[in-house]
Each structure stands twice: as C-alpha cells, then as structure tokens.
C-alpha cells in the first residue's frame, strides 16, 4: 500500500512539474496519445478491462487493437487483415501484476477464412520495476518479459515490455536483453487525448 502511495505521489509530482502534457492515472481514464516517429497511438479504456488502441502509421494503413489491461493483445483489425487471440484461461487472474509474478496462458489464434493450427502460449515474467521517461514525464513501469511459443514449444517471439500499470499501456519494448544487440523501441511523447 505504501509503495502504491509513493508511486502515485511521484506521478502527481511529474504531472505538476511538467504541466498538462504529462498524463497521470486519473487522466488516463479519459484516454491519451503516445507517439514516436512515424507512429501515433490513441489509447482509450474500454469495457471488461480492455484498452482500445488506434494506431496511425506514416507508411502503413491504420490499425485498431484491443489489449487486455493494455498489455495482452486479444484482437487486431486493419485493412490488411483481422486477428483474434482467444485466451483459454482467465486473464483477470493475472492482474494486477507484481514483481516476481510468472504466468502461462494458452491462446487460440483466429482469423477470417483460416482454421486454427493449434494453440499458442504466452509466458509472462515480471522481472522488476523501473522508471521510463516520455519527453519530460517519468513513469513507474514493470519490466514484463513476454515469450510467445507455438504448440510445439518453439519460441516465436520474445521481448520485455516496459508496462505502466497506471496508464494501462506498454511504453516501450526491449529486445535481445542482456546481449550486445540489446535495443529499446519505445514511444517518445505522451499527451491527453483531445476530447
């Protein structure tokens, strides 16, 4: 409880120090915009713990995603296709995330005119807490290692999401962690969603 109070105080201080451009937990409930060169993402809370994300790309068609708690993708829609990831377990039981938590969830991937070829697995491991900066704003994030595997157990993708629970959004992804090829791809600015 004390850590949550301190975290909220830090977020409030960040918002006060940098004016209206910093979005805090309360403002996030009405939506916000994250941007990096070539990508603009509008985050809006939705029913059932979902977060709707409207992505606009400089060189691609727009895309809409629905992410459970702003972290786990369950639906994607664009002019290039549609994809639903149906969890075979209760995602609500995974949240709120805490440092040291680990979980494994199976999904069935569905897309139009394509039969599922088996299940996929998402392994989550909350490695710890960090601070991440977006412009002049600082946010407390959880480093969440996400590993996607096919039914045979082969790794399809792995990265560490820098997830801000107060915003319900991953602010960046860290790839090839702990190697000489380590890189971070993340948003650079945040602002409230214009009403």
Predicted segment positions?
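Bacterial N-terminal signal peptides that target proteins for export
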Residues: 1-6
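Acidic, serine/threonine-rich low-complexity disordered tracts
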Residues: 20-76, 107-195
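N-terminal signal peptide c-region/cleavage motif recognized by signal peptidases
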Residues: 13-16
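Extracellular-facing segments of soluble proteins and assemblies that are Gly/Ser/Thr-biased and enriched
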Residues: 78-124
């Amino acid at each position: 409880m004390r850590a949550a109070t301190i975290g909220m105080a830090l977020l409030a201080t960040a918002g006060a120090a940098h004016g209206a451009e910093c979005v805090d937990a309360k403002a996030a409930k009405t939506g916000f915009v994250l941007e990096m060169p070539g990508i603009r993402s509008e985050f809006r809370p939705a029913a059932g713990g979902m977060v709707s994300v409207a992505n606009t790309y400089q060189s691609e068609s727009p895309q809409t995603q629905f992410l459970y708690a702003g972290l786990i993708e369950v639906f994607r829609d664009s002019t290039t296709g549609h994809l639903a990831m149906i969890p075979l377990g209760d995602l609500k039981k995974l949240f709120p995330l805490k440092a040291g938590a680990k979980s494994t969830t199976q999904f069935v991937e569905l897309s139009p005119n394509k039969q599922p070829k088996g299940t996929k697995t998402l392994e989550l491991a909350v490695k710890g807490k960090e601070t991440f900066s977006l412009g002049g704003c600082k946010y407390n994030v959880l480093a969440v290692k996400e590993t996607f595997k096919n039914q045979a157990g082969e790794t399809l993708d792995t990265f560490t999401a820098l997830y801000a629970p107060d915003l319900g959004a991953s602010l960046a992804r860290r790839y090839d962690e702990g190697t000489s090829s380590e890189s971070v791809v993340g948003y650079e600015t945040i602002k409230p969603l214009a009403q």
